[in-house]
């Protein structure tokens, strides 16, 4: 289920005449050797799974997302002094979603324990349950006090659906229930919500759980100062941040390769300043990008956007330490 990094995906242009400053990602990414320390390194972990999308009656194909993101990352310019490792993929076989989520949670937990900053590449947004699980296990082992974790989701959907089985539509409800069992606070903000893609039941559940949100029509450039104030207020209330980006938060013309394209969406001119603010906070512990479906993409638009957002996080985040109390 967990496979080592495939080095053949890391290929691209080589500008040898430019020296070290002309390097690209494919020239600097290394395999995450299980025996080596990772203090300060960015660690990519793929989640090749769309079983949660299938359970949520969406359009499948996101299982191929991690490889597509890596291919777009490969030719991006590398920044000097930043170590990047590839921790391989967790692949979901058939409908074995829970096993795949457990496996990814374990991979992320291990990367955090080794001092890395993990970025998970989806895959459906069911990966959020695994991402939170990995961070929760890491933090729970370091303090008897409930950690103040903030989940910031850039998404057109709350993903708070009810249901006996987990799916791409349930992860944050599952996290809320897990926090309640642990006696931890549930701090969740969802920015980019579409009023026409969430039922009244989901808005009611969000209010019941104390979720903070902004609608997509409140997130254009004219509203950017207020959006960043909302982000700052959220960051001030927490010690550890998990940033998750569902690509369907973007306009359909920018991100067509998703299961549920947005009729409106939030422009990159707003999404990127949010990412920058969170990455620079010193509190970001883990990030992921979800819902890329290459079979629905046009000219790799969505994959390119996903890679740009991953690189934006990498460029903005400070090197992580080995422990987060």
Curated annotation (Swiss-Prot):
It is an enzyme of class 3 (hydrolase). InterPro entries: HutG, Ureohydrolase, Ureohydrolase_dom_sf. It catalyses: N-formimidoyl-L-glutamate + H2O = formamide + L-glutamate. Signal peptide: none annotated. Mn(2+) 1 binds at residues 125, 155, 159, 246. Keywords: Histidine metabolism, Hydrolase, Manganese, Metal-binding. GO terms for biological process: L-histidine catabolic process to glutamate and formamide; L-histidine catabolic process to glutamate and formate; putrescine biosynthetic process from arginine, via agmatine. Binds 2 manganese ions per subunit. Pathway: Amino-acid degradation; L-histidine degradation into L-glutamate; L-glutamate from N-formimidoyl-L-glutamate (hydrolase route): step 1/1. Mn(2+) 2 binds at residues 155, 157, 246, 248. NCBIfam families: hutG. Catalyzes the conversion of N-formimidoyl-L-glutamate to L-glutamate and formamide. This is Formimidoylglutamase. It comes from Ralstonia nicotianae (strain ATCC BAA-1114 / GMI1000) (Ralstonia solanacearum). The lineage of its organism: Bacteria, Pseudomonadati, Pseudomonadota, Betaproteobacteria, Burkholderiales. The gene is hutG.
């Amino acid at each position: 289920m967990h496979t080592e990094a495939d080095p053949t995906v890391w290929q691209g242009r080589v500008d040898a005449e430019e020296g070290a400053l002309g390097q690209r990602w494919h020239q600097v990414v290394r395999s995450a050797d299980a025996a080596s320390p990772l203090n300060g390194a960015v660690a990519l972990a793929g989640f090749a799974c769309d079983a949660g999308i299938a359970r949520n009656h969406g359009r499948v194909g996101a299982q191929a997302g991690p490889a597509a993101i890596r291919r777009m990352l490969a030719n991006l310019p590398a920044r000097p002094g930043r170590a990047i490792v590839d921790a391989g993929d967790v692949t979901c076989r058939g409908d074995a979603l829970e096993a795949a989520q457990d496996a990814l949670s374990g991979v992320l937990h291990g990367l955090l324990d080794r001092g890395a900053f993990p970025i998970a590449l989806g895959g459906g947004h069911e990966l959020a349950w695994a991402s939170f699980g990995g961070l929760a296990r890491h933090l729970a082992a370091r303090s008897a006090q409930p950690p103040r974790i903030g989940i910031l989701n850039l998404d057109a959907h709350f993903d708070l659906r009810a249901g006996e089985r987990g799916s791409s539509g349930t992860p944050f409800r599952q996290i809320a229930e897990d926090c309640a069992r642990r006696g931890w606070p549930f701090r969740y903000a969802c920015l980019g919500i579409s009023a026409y893609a969430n039922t009244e039941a989901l808005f009611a559940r969000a209010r019941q759980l104390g979720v903070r949100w902004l609608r997509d029509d409140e997130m254009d450039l004219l509203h950017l100062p207020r959006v960043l104030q909302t982000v700052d207020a959220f960051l001030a209330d927490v010690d550890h941040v998990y940033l998750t980006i569902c690509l369907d938060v973007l306009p359909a013309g920018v991100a067509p390769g998703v299961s549920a394209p947005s009729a409106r969406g939030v422009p990159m001119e707003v999404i990127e300043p949010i990412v920058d603010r969170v990455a620079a906070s010193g509190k970001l512990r883990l990030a992921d990008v979800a819902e890329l479906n290459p079979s629905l993409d046009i000219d790799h638009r969505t994959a390119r956007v996903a890679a740009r957002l991953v690189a934006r996080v990498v460029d903005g985040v400070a090197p992580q330490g080995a422990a987060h109390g």
